[in-house]
């Protein structure tokens, strides 16, 4: 089994931060790091008849890509939509729920006691399904 990279660990820490945020908002996490041939869904959650697919971007600094937002371009959105469709085909009981694609931007912050992770921005309905 390959070694985990610090980027993978940072990504997982960012996902854990967003997972906690969503659970505090009353969302039930249905899947984390769900994979299919089209890619990975970082988080899938439901609440009150609504289903969200959350793409989490974790960055250690300001960077050039607006804290990860620019990394969710058209091609990435298309892969996420296909992955969401694959998820729904495997979970037909969820197919009638209203679906939304959100993007969570997480910052890694250095501190005296090590690094911490904080939700920098949460974009509800960051993009939509197009025909």
UniProtKB/Swiss-Prot annotation:
The protein's matches in Pfam families, at most eight in alphabetical order, are given as: UPF0102
* MF term (GO), any: nucleic acid binding
Please indicate which superkingdom the organism of origin belongs to. Answer: Bacteria
Q: SUPFAM superfamilies given for it?
A: Restriction endonuclease-like
Q: Which residues form a coiled coil?
A: none
Q: Identify the Gene3D superfamilies for this entry.
A: 3.40.1350.10
NCBIfam families reported for this sequence: PRK12497.1-3, YraN family protein
PANTHER family in the record? UPF0102 PROTEIN YRAN
Protein name stated in the entry? UPF0102 protein CYA_0708
């Amino acid at each position: 089994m390959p070694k985990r990279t610090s980027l993978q660990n940072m990504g997982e820490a960012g996902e854990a931060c967003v997972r906690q945020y969503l659970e505090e908002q009353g969302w039930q996490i249905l899947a984390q790091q769900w994979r299919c041939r089209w890619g990975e869904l970082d988080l899938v959650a439901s609440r009150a008849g609504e289903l969200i697919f959350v793409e989490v971007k974790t960055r250690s600094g300001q960077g050039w890509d607006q804290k990860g937002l620019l990394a969710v371009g058209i091609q990435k959105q298309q892969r996420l939509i296909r992955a969401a469709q694959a998820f729904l085909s495997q979970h037909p009981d969820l197919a009638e729920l209203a679906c939304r694609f959100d993007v969570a931007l997480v910052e890694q912050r250095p501190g005296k006691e090590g690094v911490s992770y904080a939700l920098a921005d949460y974009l509800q309905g960051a993009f939509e399904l197009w025909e």
